[in-house]
């Protein structure tokens, strides 16, 4: 068990994180085949999930976002449903792993896909409350220098073109406490 958990989970509609980190996971010996890692990665499109089942597990905020995405891109909506269900599981697991009076700190940002606003922070806050966290503190932080491109083109693809729409211009630090039973 832990007194403090600090994490910055992947963002929905972002990169496939297992692919992005394949070199380091192979080099450090975490897995022999990075494709295995894909199956356990938050929101990965490479492991089976039942869309209808995901919809039934989604929180109200997650369901609202997925429904909006479904109108513009069904495959992204399905991926987002898996991501949000995974994040709900992450907050529950974090709560279970904390000692009483322990804290969990998440760093996450909101994004947009084809003009659908994706409020990851709001979904995470709802998930943390649902998992049992209390006294949530939300800190909004402007991102001034981001190494990975913060822009998307009209098709929703990442680009380095500064005339494109900026995403990930701010992030949220969300801190929750687990009180004694």
Language-model-detected regions and their locations in the chain:
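Class I S-adenosyl-L-methionine-dependent methyltransferase catalytic core
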Residues: 1-106, 110-181
């Amino acid at each position: 068990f832990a007194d403090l958990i600090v994490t910055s989970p992947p963002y929905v509609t972002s990169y496939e994180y297992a692919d992005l980190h394949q070199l380091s996971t192979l080099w450090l010996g975490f897995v022999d085949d990075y494709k295995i890692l894909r199956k356990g990665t938050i929101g990965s499109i490479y492991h089976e999930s039942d869309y209808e089942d995901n919809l039934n597990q989604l929180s109200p905020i997650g369901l609202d976002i997925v429904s909006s995405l479904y109108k513009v891109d069904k495959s992204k909506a399905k991926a987002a449903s898996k991501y949000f269900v995974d994040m709900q599981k992450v907050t529950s697991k974090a709560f279970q792993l904390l000692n009483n009076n322990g804290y969990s700190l998440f760093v996450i940002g909101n994004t947009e896909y084809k003009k659908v606003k994706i409020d990851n922070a709001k979904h995470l806050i709802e998930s943390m409350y649902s998992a049992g966290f209390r006294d949530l503190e939300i800190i909004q932080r402007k991102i001034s220098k981001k190494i990975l491109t913060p822009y998307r083109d009209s098709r929703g693809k990442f680009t380095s073109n500064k005339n494109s729409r900026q995403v990930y211009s701010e992030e949220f630090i969300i801190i929750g406490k687990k009180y004694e039973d």
